[in-house]
Swiss-Prot record:
<feature type="binding site">
    <location>
        <position position="114"/>
    </location>
    <ligand>
        <name>S-adenosyl-L-methionine</name>
    </ligand>
</feature>
<feature type="binding site">
    <location>
        <begin position="46"/>
        <end position="48"/>
    </location>
    <ligand>
        <name>S-adenosyl-L-methionine</name>
    </ligand>
</feature>
<comment type="similarity">
    <text>Belongs to the methyltransferase superfamily. RsmH family.</text>
</comment>
<dbReference type="GO" id="GO:0070475">
    <property type="term" value="P:rRNA base methylation"/>
</dbReference>
<dbReference type="Pfam" id="PF01795">
    <property type="entry name" value="Methyltransf_5"/>
</dbReference>
<keyword id="KW-0949">S-adenosyl-L-methionine</keyword>
<keyword id="KW-0698">rRNA processing</keyword>
<feature type="binding site">
    <location>
        <position position="107"/>
    </location>
    <ligand>
        <name>S-adenosyl-L-methionine</name>
    </ligand>
</feature>
<dbReference type="InterPro" id="IPR023397">
    <property type="entry name" value="SAM-dep_MeTrfase_MraW_recog"/>
</dbReference>
<keyword id="KW-0489">Methyltransferase</keyword>
<feature type="binding site">
    <location>
        <position position="65"/>
    </location>
    <ligand>
        <name>S-adenosyl-L-methionine</name>
    </ligand>
</feature>
<protein>
    <recommendedName>
        <fullName>Ribosomal RNA small subunit methyltransferase H</fullName>
        <ecNumber>2.1.1.199</ecNumber>
    </recommendedName>
</protein>
<dbReference type="InterPro" id="IPR029063">
    <property type="entry name" value="SAM-dependent_MTases_sf"/>
</dbReference>
<keyword id="KW-0808">Transferase</keyword>
<dbReference type="InterPro" id="IPR002903">
    <property type="entry name" value="RsmH"/>
</dbReference>
<feature type="binding site">
    <location>
        <position position="92"/>
    </location>
    <ligand>
        <name>S-adenosyl-L-methionine</name>
    </ligand>
</feature>
<comment type="function">
    <text>Specifically methylates the N4 position of cytidine in position 1402 (C1402) of 16S rRNA.</text>
</comment>
Amino acid sequence: MQTDLSDSSFFNHKSVMTDEIMASLEHYPLIHNNQLKGIDATLGGGGHSYHLLRKYSDLNIIGLDQDPFARKSALKKLDEFKSRIDIRASNFADFVPKEKVSFVIADLGVNSNQLDDPKRGFSFQKDGPLDMRMNPLLDVDAEKLIEVLNEKDLANLIYKYGDERLSRKIARKIKLDLKENGKYSGTKELAYSIAGCFPPKQRYKKIHPATRTFQALRIAVNKEIEVLEKFLQVVPEWLLPGGIISVISFHSLEDRLVKSCFKNDQRLKNLTKKPITPSEEEVELNKRARSGKLRIAQLN
């Protein structure tokens, strides 16, 4: 099922740690000079770029996003800055800039539209197809993934990307369901089946028992870890001397990769020994910000 790009009424994503992102760029020695150029590697709804373009009147930004719905929404949000924003249909790991820039920002979180639109299949709060593709042109969605993987590989995936200790039991149940009943009807049926793998007392906790498995499937479908690894390898080559790279991550796998890169890449100076986290005020206003971690590095 395709997302209707003509309907942007439900795109209401709140950008995370905007103030902290803005402050991170002050490390760049020429941040207040004319002809400033930057890359928003995860444009989303355009929130971070909007605030940056408002603050720096001579700033030009290249905004990258593989999600066509996000790009359409960002175009509307950033219309007043259309002469200074260049929106590209690209995964950040595949992009090759023609010239070096002063900064790169990346927010690795799933945007609220992707979570809240049931047709995207990222969530089980409302029933939808087992999709989970950030780029609808990808060949393999979540439904296809659980079909083609054998039980062992599916269990390993759920454990590695979801840190789910019941991964083997869950994988066994999923493959048994597929064998006996064919495809799942949607996200709710899969979530219900996963919940059945847990003891009754654990099925009704604050965090739904299917949450970790859904995270693992989403990461695998979009190859998020492989893409991030490639991005971290190439992004220093995008920067001018003294340029800033600011990355917000939302789970431990991502944060470990960013931390390791910023600490060990000899091209970079690590500016955050410990990650910057959202303020209590922001978390109160936007619960989805609570697990965000911002790390900053500077090109030597």
